[in-house]
Amino acid sequence: MQMADLEKKLENSVLPPLLKRELSEKILREEISEEYLVDEIISETTRAYERTLVEPGEAVGVVAAQSIGEPGTQMTMRTFHYAGVAELNVTLGLPRMIEIVDARKEPSTPTMTIYLNDEFKGNREKAATVAKNIESTNVESVSEDISVDLVNECITIILNNQQLESRGLTVPDVIDAIKSKMKLKIEDHENVLNLKIKTPSLKALRKRLPKVRAIHLKGVQNIKRVIIRKEVDEYILYSEGSNIKEVFDIEGVDTTKTTTNNIVEIQDVLGIEAARNAIIYEMDATLGNQGLTVDKRHLMMVADLMCTDGVVKPIGRHGIGGEKASVLARAAFEETVKHLYSASMRGYVDELGGVVENIIVGKPISMGTGCIDICIDKSYEEGKEL
């Protein structure tokens, strides 16, 4: 049986396109040629698919909420080490779950999992070179001491030659970086730099000291540390800090697999669809790390709701909860007086189209049997044919 024959058989099937393709490939791979067997497989697959569909009128939102919320009560409040990487602390458990649904712009412990291209992933030295190019280096990280010299009225930097060499930098590189950021006169005494300003004073020198320490020399901004680990037959980099846009520009990085736990950053760089997938993955991984299993469709429901407007929105009064069309639904969530006061000032009308507002006014909700309207023919007589 050919692919074209299978496509014709599945043409009017209710199965989604992806499932149709996978089923066709499986039948061809197993070399099933008998037509009655193929028909039976398609029929059984269709029945199994239809059993997985939600019944009309099912309260999927409530089911999703309780399915995620109940395991959430069993989650720990502590921060654990990231899977297998003892040197990096990453927020897990309930705090991480709250971060995800709140759509925080910056996670409390941003981290990246950086995969390498075929040329780099099997060689530790090449992986270390990529790690050096990614790890952010500032003046403070290559210095033994940075202090204010009151006698000579300058800022003195004592450079660490070993650190400079390990990071592939030289003294002129440091001088050029400082000059590009600040207007200073620099005196070079081998590994000691004296930074002088036009009108020196203790206050002026102390004001410049933190800025000098933070001057960026090399690597990707915000990536404080990079750790190399061998997993199975390849080296993978784990970073403390996240900057996916700049990391993608580093030679040797596999941009198709590299990821970050910063969902808003994924949205900005890769788009809303990637952010949606990241929300599902992060929630599933956070629950799985605690030994909890939740059907992915509940997580997909939350992710779809957060991403439905094209940007990642938090589930709360500053996001989805505070933007509901119904005044009563908004008032029922949080900030009740504020919403009712605002609605009365503007003369809003609530159409009572949702669940919450109908419960508030005591009307049947449009779910389950309530989603059906029954019509009665008043002219109907018993025994009369319809």
From Swiss-Prot:
EC number: 2.7.7.6
Sorted UniProt keywords: Cytoplasm, DNA-binding, DNA-directed RNA polymerase, Nucleotidyltransferase, Transcription, Transferase
EC main group: transferase
Disulfide bridge map: none
Subcellular location: Cytoplasm
GO biological-process terms attached to the record: DNA-templated transcription
Keyword Transferase: yes
Record keyword Nucleotidyltransferase present: yes
InterPro entries from the UniProt entry: DNA-dir_RpoC_beta_prime (IPR045867), RNA_pol_Rpb1_5 (IPR007081), RPO1C (IPR012757)
Assembly description: Part of the RNA polymerase complex.
Stated family: Belongs to the RNA polymerase beta' chain family.
Stored NCBIfam families: RNA_pol_rpoA2
Protein name according to UniProt: DNA-directed RNA polymerase subunit Rpo1C
Organism phylogeny: Archaea, Methanobacteriati, Methanobacteriota, Methanomada group, Methanococci
